[in-house]
């Protein structure tokens, strides 16, 4: 039996991409899964696909009341909350400082930070009492942009650096009751969109990047799928497998940190 059997897991942005892969994985692990999802169509799809195995709540991660409504439903359903996974986010499609008009930069900043940073903070606030009671955990999705430049423009990259600070501060504030960690995936096949303020709300990340371009820059030389990143979340959520980690950011970057100066990887001819 999985360590996560009957554990109560709350994931934001569970309707597509990494969020959907996490929903699938935690259900496979026997967990009671809930998600807060902005898209009504995706909520309906989740309910149709997973039935009683999913509690899908339509709502916005920038709205505390929506979070509280979801937590109330989770506690009614499961009687507890063991892990909160802040995952919903938006990307800036590499919108640069020089080429982005000042007024667009300002509105884009507020929209992107509201989702990528405030959304995590509000989720932590709504979930903290239940997680303190269960001595559970929080896990936040980062990005390779939390470590390196060029994984987005200044808006996205700064938001992910801000999220690392939030993880460390929450890990400090909530210890010893709640473990708080992060996972930073590299580029993958997903439907990640951009801010409406930048005219990117209908543009997905795969319209800006190709599988070939992503695989070429990774030393492991493959194009990741969302399911490839779910393992670290399962480990961090497990009390048995993660008794000691808090304030830790797992850099799941397919080897980006060890790229060579002359070659992406030295073993390409092996």
From Swiss-Prot:
Pathway membership, UniProt: Aromatic compound metabolism; 3-phenylpropanoate degradation
Segments passing through the bilayer: none
Record-listed E.C. numbers: 1.3.1.87
Disulfide bond positions: none
PROSITE patterns per UniProt: ADH_SHORT
Domain of life: Bacteria
Its job: Converts 3-phenylpropionate-dihydrodiol (PP-dihydrodiol) and cinnamic acid-dihydrodiol (CI-dihydrodiol) into 3-(2,3-dihydroxylphenyl)propanoic acid (DHPP) and 2,3-dihydroxicinnamic acid (DHCI), respectively.
HAMAP family: HcaB
Name of this protein: 3-phenylpropionate-dihydrodiol/cinnamic acid-dihydrodiol dehydrogenase
Organism of origin: Shigella flexneri
């Amino acid at each position: 039996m999985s360590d996560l059997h009957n554990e109560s897991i709350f994931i934001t942005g569970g309707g597509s991409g990494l969020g959907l892969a996490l929903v699938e994985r935690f259900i496979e692990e026997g967990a009671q899964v809930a998600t807060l999802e902005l898209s009504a169509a995706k909520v309906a799809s989740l309910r149709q696909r997973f039935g009683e195995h999913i509690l899908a709540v339509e709502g916005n991660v920038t709205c505390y009341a929506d979070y509280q409504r979801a937590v109330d439903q989770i506690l009614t359903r499961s009687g507890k909350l063991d892990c909160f996974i802040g995952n919903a986010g938006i990307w800036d499609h590499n919108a640069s400082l020089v080429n982005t008009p000042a007024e667009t930069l300002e509105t884009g900043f507020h929209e992107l930070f509201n989702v990528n940073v405030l959304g995590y903070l509000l989720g932590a606030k709504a979930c903290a009492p239940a997680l303190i009671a269960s001595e559970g955990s929080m896990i936040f999705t980062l990005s390779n942009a939390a470590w390196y430049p060029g994984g987005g423009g200044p808006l996205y990259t700064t938001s992910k650096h801000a999220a690392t600070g939030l993880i460390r501060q929450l890990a400090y504030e909530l210890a010893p009751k709640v473990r708080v960690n992060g996972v930073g995936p590299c580029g993958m096949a997903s439907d990640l969109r951009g801010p409406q303020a930048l005219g990117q709300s209908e543009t997905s990340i795969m319209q800006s990047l190709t599988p070939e371009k992503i695989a070429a820059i990774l030393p492991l030389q493959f194009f990741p799928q969302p399911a490839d990143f779910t393992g670290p979340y399962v480990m961090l959520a497990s009390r048995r497998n993660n008794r000691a980690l808090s304030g830790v950011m797992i850099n799941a970057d397919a080897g980006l940190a060890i790229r060579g100066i002359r070659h992406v990887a030295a073993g390409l001819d092996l």
